[in-house]
Amino acid sequence: MSRFDTLLQSIARTTVLCVGDLMLDEFVYGEVSRISPEAPTPVIAVQRSEINVGGAGNVARNIAAIGARCIFVGLIGDDEAGRTLSAEIARESRIEPLLVCDPARPTTRKVRFVSEHFSTHMLRADWETASAASSEIEQRLLDAILPQLQRADIVLLSDYAKGVLTERVIVSVIEAARKLGKRVIVDPKSANFAIYRGATLLTPNRKEFVSATRSAAETVDDIAAAAQDAMALADCEAMLVTQSEHGMTLVPRVGEPIHVPAMPVKVRDVSGAGDTVAAVLAVVLAAGADWATAMRAASAAAAVAVSKNGTAVVTPAELRRKILPHASLAAEEKIIGSEAELDLRLAEWRREGLRVGFTNGCFDILHPGHVKVLTAARGACDRLIVGLNSDASVRRLKGESRPVQNERARAEVLAALEAVDLVAIFGEDTPLKLIKRIVPSVLVKGGDYTREQVVGHEIVAARGGEVLLVDVLPGFSTTSLVEKAREGTT
């Protein structure tokens, strides 16, 4: 078992108490192709829309998605947006919501209008009251929070300055948590870090850090110097400054700064990436990891989150694929077990703008001819899926004496190759059904076929894809190898 798997097992046993500003995130996707005749403003032709639990609610969703349990305390209004949020959170089996309703304020709601094609935000509309909660609501929040501290392994305060985390709530929660020996992570919004006094870790982004410290924060040394004064003011153990494409820097009260560069990734949407960082930091630290491990996990999770549209969560499988070197992934990670899993991987790759390739075969006894085709196929794409004939399919095509190796053994051999990203077993005589599902950008076969003989060529061509024929190596075929083995010749 890898260290990552051991960490995931520990995460599954942790509970995070998350408190913060809950909001409803709505995304309206469309395109602009004309200007309104009524006023000089663009007209968005809406194509689709979606809703997500946002703000501190997205932090809670990320905590649950990575495998931990989350007790979540937030504030909603007595309105449709609040009821929608309650229903959405109730669907999350690993989140225990304790929502306080304040009829005097609306539920925070943000509607973003986004270009479907370019993934750029064109407009945002907000419904909110950012004033602090009343003393009555403060008390109801504390009545919900304080009894849960004993159950939590770590506390996470997600401050969006929408009224939940008042100074009274912050001070009361941190003091109570410290008495119980619980660590507190704060994702701050206030430029006055002193109100978070006693927290274990503050996680401002660069803009928030500059505003609070009045420093340039252009280098690790700049951040380290300014953070020491800020930590003294906030009486915290460490400060982590996130810097988007420049990575993240952790400055401990005692010890050397740790900087983790950002992972290269095609950014589609940065909405909620900070939520993901805070959530992963909390669960990994609660699971017993050190600062450096927690930072690497958070950085990898952020890279996954920004490659998705909307307010996104990160799963353990996505985190594993981002953290572990490609060649280190276990064979079972590359062998697809269901159509739903295949669809999930494809969606993930396409969100990242990756070119997907496909080839297929029986691969009964892997030989240099196979390796040449697979290597060429991988060179023509960013991710290669290999369609593998099932045992029953091979018998129909090759006869009752085949395959020599069963489908699981053949799949594991293929999955061990660095050129192969996924192996999908199909039971039909041809991979046509699989190709229709994948719709690859490039379809690869050996040069002993003509373009018209390649199954699925018309599907790929219709989508503007490429059919690639690779010259075969003479003298290599599984059939001839089997015959030679039976004859005892080489």
UniProtKB/Swiss-Prot annotation:
Gene (UniProt): hldE
GO MF annotation list: ATP binding; heptose 7-phosphate kinase activity; heptose-1-phosphate adenylyltransferase activity; phosphotransferase activity, alcohol group as acceptor
Protein source organism: Rhodopseudomonas palustris (strain BisB5)
UniProt-recorded name of the protein: Bifunctional protein HldE
HAMAP family associated with the record: HldE (MF_01603)
Matches recorded under InterPro entries: Bifunc_HldE, Carboh/pur_kinase_PfkB_CS, Cyt_trans-like, PfkB_dom, RfaE_dom_I, RfaE_dom_II, Ribokinase-like, Rossmann-like_a/b/a_fold
Pathway in which the depicted protein is active: Nucleotide-sugar biosynthesis; ADP-L-glycero-beta-D-manno-heptose biosynthesis; ADP-L-glycero-beta-D-manno-heptose from D-glycero-beta-D-manno-heptose 7-phosphate: step 1/4; Nucleotide-sugar biosynthesis; ADP-L-glycero-beta-D-manno-heptose biosynthesis; ADP-L-glycero-beta-D-manno-heptose from D-glycero-beta-D-manno-heptose 7-phosphate: step 3/4
Annotated active site: 275
Ranges where the record places region Cytidylyltransferase: 358-490
Pfam families the UniProt entry points to: CTP_transf_like (PF01467), PfkB (PF00294)
Record's subunit section: Homodimer.
Binding sites annotated in the UniProt record for ATP: 205-208
Chain coiled-coil ranges: none
Entry's EC annotation: 2.7.1.167, 2.7.7.70
Lineage: Bacteria, Pseudomonadati, Pseudomonadota, Alphaproteobacteria, Hyphomicrobiales
Domain of life: Bacteria
NCBIfam families to which the protein is assigned, alphabetical: cyt_tran_rel, rfaE_dom_I, rfaE_dom_II
GO cellular component terms listed in the entry, alphabetical order: cytosol
